[in-house]
Amino acid sequence: MPDFARLRAKRLFLLDLDGTLYLDERLFDGAADFLRAIRSRGGTYRFLTNNSSRGAESYVEKLRRLGVEAETSDFLTSVDALVAHLHAQGMAEKLLYVCGTQSMKRQLTQAGLRLTDDRDAAVDALVMGFDTELTFQKLEDACILLNRGADYLATNPDWVCPTWYGFVPDCGSVCEMLFRATGRRPYVIGKPRPDMAHLAMVHGGFSAEETVLLGDRLYTDIACGVNAGIDTVLVLSGETKEADLAGSAVQPTFVLGSVAEYLSILQE
C-alpha cells in the first residue's frame, strides 16, 4: 500500500506543465482544484518546464486563459537554469549563437548575455533550445560552429513535445540530428539535471524531504527528481504509460493516474 501520508505532508510541489496539468489548450480535470488545495494547506508550488520556446509571461497568459491564476515568479524554465549555469561556469561573457525562438533570445539578452546570429563571428558556444522557428540555415550554421569546436549546450533532452494531434520533434531530436552530422553531443541543462529542482528548493527555503516533483515523463521529470534526491510522482496523463515502467531504469516514488488523484489524496 503506497504511503499516501507522505504525499500529504509535502510543502513544495514542483510541477511539470505539458502532459501533467494540461495538454495544449485543455486543462486536465482537477488541475485547478489541485493547485488551490496546495495553497489552502499552506503549501507552495513551482512550475518547472523544459520548454525554452516561450518565457514565463506567456505561460502566465496561458494558465490564466485556462482559468488558473499565476505569476511569473511561479515558474522556473530551462532558460533560467541555462542562465544560472553560464554564470556558475564563468561563461556569462561568452558570445553565444542560439538556435532558439525570438522569445528565448530575448530572455537571454535581458539576462545580460551576449548573442549573435553571425556564424562567422567569434562564437564561443552554440546553444540549442526547443526552436519552433527552426530553419535549415540555423541547422547549417550549427554544424559549421560545431565542426569549428564551439562549446555546445542544450536546454533540454526531450525527444518530442506533446500537442493535441500527437507529438512534434523537441530539442533532443534536433540534437540527435546534429550528432549524426557532426559527432558532437551537447551538455544538457534542463531536466533530468537537478538544477531547476535545486533552484526552487533554495529560493523557497524547503528541504528535500518537504519537496515532491510531479511529471509525466520518466527520462526528464522523474529523473530530475531522482537526481535531486526528492520524492517523485509519475502521472499517467501524458507521455508515459504504465507499461513503460517495466523497462525503465528510472522509477518514480509514486504512480498516479493524474493530478486529480493527488487532489483526492490531499482531501482524505
Language model feature labels by segment:
Residues N51:
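Conserved phosphate/oxyanion-binding catalytic-loop motifs
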Residues M1-L15, L23-R41, R54-L76, V83-E268:
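Asp-based, Mg2+/Mn2+-dependent phosphohydrolase catalytic module
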Residues T44:
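N-terminal phosphate-binding loop and flanking beta/alpha elements of the actin-like ATPase fold
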